[in-house]
Amino acid sequence: MSSIVEIHGREVIDSRGNPTVEVDVYTEDGGFGRAAVPSGASTGSREAVELRDGDKSRFLGKGVRKAVDAVNTVLAEVVLGMEVADQKGIDAAMIALDGTHNKSRLGANAILGISMAVAKAAADECDLPLYRYLGGTNTSLLPVPMMNIINGGAHADNNVDIQEFMIMPVAATSCTEAIRMGAEVFHSLKKVLKSKGLNTAVGDEGGFAPNLGSNEEALKVIVEAIEAAGYKPGEDIKLALDCASSEFYNKETGNYDLTGEGRVLTKQELVAFYEDLVAKYPIISIEDGFDESDWDGWKLMTEALGNKIQLVGDDLFVTNSKILAEGISKGIANSILVKVNQIGTLTETFEAVEMAQRAGYTAVISHRSGETEDATIADIAVALNAGQIKTGSMSRSDRIAKYNQLIRIEEELGGMARFEGMKVFYNLR
């Protein structure tokens, strides 16, 4: 394969109206790759650093000209002339140039933009779809979608503490059918909310953001919507939560302030709260049930629920192999959420997923609340045979872009395509 001859970064706009980095990579044999970098709202403190300008006169300080300049100057100088197929070498060279543990000098948004665009250019030069280039010939597993249909927490302006209430169409026979089932429940939920006089405006990730009386009320209306769409809750469709509990954790007291419900819970009480929800509703997965720093709380939760449901570490692990290794050794959680911009290169992303899978942890490939039309994560989910993807609701084109790419991939794979439904939770008893 040929070498990289041109790299160009630019500032574009994400789904929240904030700037982000987009990178184009060209090879000497005509390969081309373009990638846009996502951005999170609720972020883990140990995530790789997203470089913002801080100039209040542009985009309220959120401009990314510094990161774009890094792409077009110092990073380009290192990467130009390198073999486009040398993903590990390119990523390692950029990490070394940055020289920090969290990519804070040049910005994870700059480094990731190049990392993803390089992979796309290499795939283009090989005349292969990205999932096949990254995953090889055995790539065939389509993911079960986690579809965020009610938004709360940092993703919405309402009184619901839990950030995401999701559905997982586990009884579907294909990813395309799962997407259809999710769309039907989404439209059914809109009718249910309207019938109750509730708001049907959507949050950052396309889910509805109604003012509900409690977190449990959100689960009740979702179950009602599933039934109204003609499906059986718990049999056809499971529920999943992203609590994003760092957003309601009180570091001074060590307690969890569910302000929407007017309750303050200790670690033990929060575990009991989750156990009660799991007993009452067909919940198969809980993400970030405890704060990223509250490993004692995570241990309590894993001991109580780790054999029954998927316990996903997002802010807990931040797609970082070193932190994940510590979690595995301590028996914390049983799944990792994978966000490419938390770590900043494709190489490190793949390393984290491979480590998780070797340890019997599941991996959920995820979007961020600030997204673009870039659908790279759909290809990554298939390339890694991850079996699960979390990429928002059935509205907003930045979310739909990923679902449509999965539909195309499944069609392209034809009879080779696999969709495993409940089997993706291979570590539950």
UniProtKB/Swiss-Prot annotation:
Catalytic residues? 205, 339
Report which reactions are catalysed by this protein.
(2R)-2-phosphoglycerate = phosphoenolpyruvate + H2O
A GO term for molecular function: phosphopyruvate hydratase activity
Describe the family membership recorded for this protein in Swiss-Prot or TrEMBL. Answer: Belongs to the enolase family.
Residues that bind Mg(2+): 242, 287, 314
Q: What is this protein called?
A: Enolase
Single biological process term from Gene Ontology = glycolytic process
SUPFAM superfamilies per UniProt: Enolase C-terminal domain-like (SSF51604), Enolase N-terminal domain-like (SSF54826)
Q: Tell me, in one coarse class, where this protein mainly resides.
A: cytoplasm
Quick one: which pathway? Carbohydrate degradation; glycolysis; pyruvate from D-glyceraldehyde 3-phosphate: step 4/5
EC numbers for this chain = 4.2.1.11
